[in-house]
């Protein structure tokens, strides 16, 4: 919005040309989201407390968590407001990628909000059923995947429609342009054509998987938000590179026109995330809830698909992956041993993985900071793929 206003007035006020610089708007988007979060945070927390939107704590979990009972949840609303307002202020409204990422983010946020609302307001411990939640995640994920399959390689929505019609006329056999191929990090000559259906399936898995993985990681004070900020910021760097004809050519990446504008969204996400951490640091004054975790995970997955860095997201989000795999292994092993031996056995003291380390003697703050450090290392490895190819 501010970009359009500045472009309209810049002939009379030359200093407004600074709005044409993506990096300037990215910095301002981050600062705006940070100020919104810090400014409205106390009000949101106070309001959630008045509404008695308190988090229930499992009695069979780490005993140190019992003191958290009643801490207001659904604080992810604060993050989403900061991201949405800042992005709409500083991003180019004509950019189609901004709108699809906002759609996924706010759509998944709505799913999480309904789930949280049922849990804490209606006192329904189950919230949304797994089937209902998965259904709506699938609807949004498939819509985004189908659009991006024809959008990533094109420069406008008209070209998206033309490519779609070409695919239909070809009997659904048309291969997508090379820009839509799966990029293998560290190898500049290797990429895999996916086809329309392959692209849609992979995109769906990345978006839905990332959303749920981030949600599983959100279990300790400050644990999930810093990895989200770090990974999101790194994806912003990739977006800037892929959106630049000069940098993408120099670093041997496909040029994706319009992808650079996602740096605005990533910067807003970083600012909003740091503001939330101010209140979520141990001992937390507010929890994120599904409304924030599902949304942020969906955003990371969508951005990774647009900038063709699905595998790099898997690397940088290694903590999210480890948390998810620990749950899958725990459930699978428990069911297998119960069927085989008549009693369920566990691989970990408790899943997700962060609870295993807590029950192994690590303090909550140790788990959180060590997971942050691991994420920093993985993000640096991911960023190194920009040049080490």
Curated annotation (Swiss-Prot):
GO cellular component terms attached to this protein's record: plasma membrane
Presence of the UniProt keyword Glycoprotein in the record: no
Enzyme class: transferase
EC number, as in UniProt: 2.7.8.13
GO MF, one annotated term: UDP-N-acetylmuramoyl-L-alanyl-D-glutamyl-meso-2,6-diaminopimelyl-D-alanyl-D-alanine:undecaprenyl-phosphate transferase activity
GO biological process, one term: peptidoglycan biosynthetic process
Membrane protein topology class: Multi-pass membrane protein
Keyword field: Cell cycle, Cell division, Cell inner membrane, Cell membrane, Cell shape, Cell wall biogenesis/degradation, Magnesium, Membrane, Metal-binding, Peptidoglycan synthesis, Transferase, Transmembrane, Transmembrane helix
Cofactor: Mg(2+)
Subcellular location: Cell inner membrane
Pathway the protein acts in: Cell wall biogenesis; peptidoglycan biosynthesis
Cited InterPro entries: Glycosyl_transferase_4, PNAcMuramoyl-5peptid_Trfase, PNAcMuramoyl-5peptid_Trfase_CS
Ranges annotated as spanning the membrane: 25-45, 74-94, 97-117, 134-154, 190-210, 222-242, 259-279, 286-306, 311-331, 366-386
Reaction(s) catalysed by this chain's protein: UDP-N-acetyl-alpha-D-muramoyl-L-alanyl-gamma-D-glutamyl-meso-2,6-diaminopimeloyl-D-alanyl-D-alanine + di-trans,octa-cis-undecaprenyl phosphate = di-trans,octa-cis-undecaprenyl diphospho-N-acetyl-alpha-D-muramoyl-L-alanyl-D-glutamyl-meso-2,6-diaminopimeloyl-D-alanyl-D-alanine + UMP
Primary location: membrane
UniProt function note: Catalyzes the initial step of the lipid cycle reactions in the biosynthesis of the cell wall peptidoglycan: transfers peptidoglycan precursor phospho-MurNAc-pentapeptide from UDP-MurNAc-pentapeptide onto the lipid carrier undecaprenyl phosphate, yielding undecaprenyl-pyrophosphoryl-MurNAc-pentapeptide, known as lipid I.
UniProt xrefs under PANTHER family: PHOSPHO-N-ACETYLMURAMOYL-PENTAPEPTIDE-TRANSFERASE, PHOSPHO-N-ACETYLMURAMOYL-PENTAPEPTIDE-TRANSFERASE HOMOLOG
Family: Belongs to the glycosyltransferase 4 family. MraY subfamily.
Name by which UniProt lists this protein: Phospho-N-acetylmuramoyl-pentapeptide-transferase
Annotated organism of origin: Ralstonia pickettii (strain 12J)
Taxonomic path: Bacteria, Pseudomonadati, Pseudomonadota, Betaproteobacteria, Burkholderiales
Gene: mraY
